[in-house]
UniProtKB/Swiss-Prot annotation:
<keyword id="KW-0964">Secreted</keyword>
<dbReference type="GO" id="GO:0017080">
    <property type="term" value="F:sodium channel regulator activity"/>
</dbReference>
<protein>
    <recommendedName>
        <fullName>U2-ctenitoxin-Pk1a</fullName>
    </recommendedName>
</protein>
<feature type="disulfide bond">
    <location>
        <begin position="1"/>
        <end position="15"/>
    </location>
</feature>
<feature type="disulfide bond">
    <location>
        <begin position="8"/>
        <end position="21"/>
    </location>
</feature>
<keyword id="KW-0872">Ion channel impairing toxin</keyword>
<feature type="disulfide bond">
    <location>
        <begin position="12"/>
        <end position="47"/>
    </location>
</feature>
<keyword id="KW-0738">Voltage-gated sodium channel impairing toxin</keyword>
<dbReference type="GO" id="GO:0035792">
    <property type="term" value="C:host cell postsynaptic membrane"/>
</dbReference>
<feature type="disulfide bond">
    <location>
        <begin position="14"/>
        <end position="31"/>
    </location>
</feature>
<dbReference type="GO" id="GO:0090729">
    <property type="term" value="F:toxin activity"/>
</dbReference>
<comment type="similarity">
    <text>Belongs to the neurotoxin 03 (Tx2) family. 05 subfamily.</text>
</comment>
<keyword id="KW-1015">Disulfide bond</keyword>
<keyword id="KW-1028">Ionotropic glutamate receptor inhibitor</keyword>
<keyword id="KW-0528">Neurotoxin</keyword>
<dbReference type="InterPro" id="IPR035285">
    <property type="entry name" value="CNTX"/>
</dbReference>
<keyword id="KW-0629">Postsynaptic neurotoxin</keyword>
Amino acid sequence: CGDINAPCQSDCDCCGYSVTCDCYWSKDCKCRESNFVIGMALRKAFCKNK
């Protein structure tokens, strides 16, 4: 999985329960710390391979 600022295609590509795949700033998605830690942890729980 990718660390902060790593390229990603979905939240499941990013390491850490609070790290989201952010496509907002450019067309190149990057992993970044989420402001919604609890919600992200719940979403990450559904990632199959991480």
